[in-house]
Amino acid sequence: MIQTETMLDVADNSGARRVQCIKVLGGSHRRYASVGDIIKVTVKEAIPRARVKKGDVMNAVVVRTKFGIRRPDGSVIRFDDNAAVILNNNKAPIATRIFGPVTRELRTEQFMKIISLAPEVL
């Protein structure tokens, strides 16, 4: 469950290391985002000479949460960190690599690129 002010790790090679959620998209008073939801983030920490700079406001999709996600069979998938992948205005990842596992819940039409780049799909 990601909400406003939540700090997330970045699971791609866009150059950002940490981002902060500034808005959960999808509804005027929506409070929480889970895996597969799009959020508005600001870059808090970035590496030098990267595609994104500190202070940039971007869209991102949540790929891992500590809270976890419940599957229809009753199992729960939890991770050790909250992580996101930074998107461009067309909802496509700006990075060319994804780090760490992602969940099968991202397997929708708009996030198939993330699934194909990920080293492991749980």
Swiss-Prot record:
<dbReference type="Pfam" id="PF00238">
    <property type="entry name" value="Ribosomal_L14"/>
</dbReference>
<protein>
    <recommendedName>
        <fullName>Large ribosomal subunit protein uL14</fullName>
    </recommendedName>
</protein>
<dbReference type="GO" id="GO:0006412">
    <property type="term" value="P:translation"/>
</dbReference>
<dbReference type="InterPro" id="IPR036853">
    <property type="entry name" value="Ribosomal_uL14_sf"/>
</dbReference>
<comment type="similarity">
    <text>Belongs to the universal ribosomal protein uL14 family.</text>
</comment>
<dbReference type="GO" id="GO:0022625">
    <property type="term" value="C:cytosolic large ribosomal subunit"/>
</dbReference>
<keyword id="KW-0689">Ribosomal protein</keyword>
<dbReference type="GO" id="GO:0003735">
    <property type="term" value="F:structural constituent of ribosome"/>
</dbReference>
<dbReference type="InterPro" id="IPR000218">
    <property type="entry name" value="Ribosomal_uL14"/>
</dbReference>
<dbReference type="InterPro" id="IPR019972">
    <property type="entry name" value="Ribosomal_uL14_CS"/>
</dbReference>
<keyword id="KW-0699">rRNA-binding</keyword>
<keyword id="KW-0687">Ribonucleoprotein</keyword>
<dbReference type="InterPro" id="IPR005745">
    <property type="entry name" value="Ribosomal_uL14_bac-type"/>
</dbReference>
<keyword id="KW-0694">RNA-binding</keyword>
<comment type="subunit">
    <text>Part of the 50S ribosomal subunit. Forms a cluster with proteins L3 and L19. In the 70S ribosome, L14 and L19 interact and together make contacts with the 16S rRNA in bridges B5 and B8.</text>
</comment>
<dbReference type="GO" id="GO:0070180">
    <property type="term" value="F:large ribosomal subunit rRNA binding"/>
</dbReference>
<comment type="function">
    <text>Binds to 23S rRNA. Forms part of two intersubunit bridges in the 70S ribosome.</text>
</comment>
